Amino acid sequence: MAIKTYKPYTPSRRYITGLSSEDITAKPSVRSLLVKLPVHAGRNSYGRITSRHKEAGAKKLYRIIDFKRRKFGIEGKVEAIEYDPYRNCRIALIAYKDGEKRYILQPRGLSVGDIVAAAESGLDIKPGNAMKLKNIPVGTIVHNVELKPGKGGQMIRSAGAYAQLMGKEEKYVILRLASGEMRQVLAECMASIGEVGNEEWANVTIGKAGRNRHRGIRPQTRGSAMNPVDHPHGGGEGKKNSGRHPVTPWGKPTKGAKTRRKKASDKLIISRRKGK
């Protein structure tokens, strides 16, 4: 998939880049798989902002994605590759032999006309197929990995994401994530073969504020540009620094301070991700 550049007929247009849509099939989405999600724009049930820098963004419909991949024993044909406004990868429309249609994440290399299937074991190792981790060969690249059997894929779903199956130990398998983290996942969990497509997304330049507004992202004001009443970094004459380590508007350390709470799943992480 190619990166598009644009002629600079306005100053903001000069630095914008986008993705070519040549891989997208020119046909409407399946209406039964579209749903309107409520817009919260970072507000809670009282209307108060609980998550800053969010807004509604452009109008869009949510595509119902099959993350579980538990339609065993029935082959499906890729009918279309579509754009999904709620995620940065493409989605593939699968038409199964029993007449049902479902959307799945498009792995790299999957195109219109290909045949995909899901089963507990015994499938070819090719992009788009899904099996239980215990039956996938060591060394295979996977995505859309479950953390609890039957719950549906929760990990490795964004554009260009992947993990490699490194080994098997009793009821667990070992995955190496793109970040370098090594972690155990239950061998009964499902995973899809291949790397998530649209890997060029990481090279796209937003280019102007308006594109982020369309995505539902509002501007972020620096704490040092505020008054002392609004932020611990506020106040002072000119561009004076705050004189303290960086903190959030509520005084908690940020910019490098560890904030992750200990969780029960920590024991499944063999080695942490590598710092960049």
UniProtKB/Swiss-Prot annotation:
The keyword Ribosomal protein applies. Transmembrane segments: none annotated. Residues 210-276 are annotated as: Disordered. One of its GO terms (cellular component) is large ribosomal subunit. GO terms for biological process: cytoplasmic translation. It comes from the Bacteria. SUPFAM superfamilies: Nucleic acid-binding proteins, Translation proteins SH3-like domain. Disulfide bonds: none annotated. The keyword rRNA-binding applies. One of the primary rRNA binding proteins. Required for association of the 30S and 50S subunits to form the 70S ribosome, for tRNA binding and peptide bond formation. It has been suggested to have peptidyltransferase activity; this is somewhat controversial. Makes several contacts with the 16S rRNA in the 70S ribosome. Belongs to the universal ribosomal protein uL2 family. Part of the 50S ribosomal subunit. Forms a bridge to the 30S subunit in the 70S ribosome. This is Large ribosomal subunit protein uL2. It comes from Campylobacter jejuni subsp. jejuni serotype O:23/36 (strain 81-176).
